[in-house]
Amino acid sequence: MQIVVASYGARIRAKKGLLIVEGREGRREYPLHQVDEVLLLTGGISISTRALRALLRAGAVVAVFDQRGEPLGIFMKPVGDATGAKRLCQYAAATDGRGLQLAKKWVWLKIRGQLENLKRWRRRLGKYGTYAESISKAINALASAATPREVMEAEAAAAEAYWAAYREITGFPGRDQEGRDPVNAGLNYGYGILKALCFKSILLAGLDPYVGFLHADKSGRPSLVLDFMEQWRPRVDAVVAQLAEELEAENGLLTHKSRLRLAAAVLEEFNATGRPLSAEIHREARSIAKALCTS
């Protein structure tokens, strides 16, 4: 179970096996053993140390976000599946080509997801055929890519067509991580939630989040998390496109109402199939860790 807390002044405490959240929306109670993640999306939230301890004992994760949706920190148990051997396998894969093959797979899944989004929007796209053809060509180019640069070139070619289509659907000015319009702010916010889920699973799988296979390593940049999350970005894109006309921004940031609405919609999408995405992410991370040490 994922719990979103986005009300300024909300209080979180634990009592008799329950997590209690009190705020503007009233009082909510959740069995602690059913809680997987608690997402704190705004400032002014207080959580007791008793609640924090109870959540950690239950194996839950508490993630704190800034106003842009960027995860600022994650409270979780010391990693139980971390071994030096797994990280050594990961470091070897980063240089012997196996890591690049994983990165290609994740980029392929992202581009395929982008193409699926276009198919859903085809009746609203005047240039659907042109966009779809460009993305299909990028998929073919990716299949023969042998270097990180070639992978990124294929990814960029698909992105050019995809975001042009997205502009036609949403009316936003174009994809810009620093964009101050509601759609770009919404994409950043949704990706932040996805990033937190991926970061948690990478750590629990015993891998190093800061050593990736495609994104360049840089101090403080969780390169593996950024590589790993690529495959699920289109699901966030679809939610933001659906809410594009509802989202509002002030000074380049989503309003409180929009943050709450988007977070609820993103988590609803992540749990819509009956197989929660957080569980899928966790399984995939463990599968990768196992494969790196057996291949």
Swiss-Prot record:
GO terms for biological process: CRISPR-cas system; defense response to virus; maintenance of CRISPR repeat elements. Keywords: Antiviral defense, DNA-binding, Endonuclease, Hydrolase, Magnesium, Manganese, Metal-binding, Nuclease. Its EC number is 3.1.-.-. One of its GO terms (molecular function) is metal ion binding. The keyword DNA-binding applies. It holds the Pfam family Cas_Cas1. Its cofactor is Mg(2+); Mn(2+). The keyword Transmembrane does not apply. It comes from the Archaea. InterPro entries: Cas1, CRISPR-assoc_Cas1, CRISPR-assoc_Cas1_C, CRISPR-assoc_Cas1_N. It is an enzyme of class 3 (hydrolase). Mn(2+) binds at residues 155, 215, 230. Belongs to the CRISPR-associated endonuclease Cas1 family. CRISPR (clustered regularly interspaced short palindromic repeat), is an adaptive immune system that provides protection against mobile genetic elements (viruses, transposable elements and conjugative plasmids). CRISPR clusters contain spacers, sequences complementary to antecedent mobile elements, and target invading nucleic acids. CRISPR clusters are transcribed and processed into CRISPR RNA (crRNA). Acts as a dsDNA endonuclease. Involved in the integration of spacer DNA into the CRISPR cassette. Homodimer, forms a heterotetramer with a Cas2 homodimer. This is CRISPR-associated endonuclease Cas1 2. It comes from Pyrobaculum aerophilum (strain ATCC 51768 / DSM 7523 / JCM 9630 / CIP 104966 / NBRC 100827 / IM2). The gene is cas1-2.
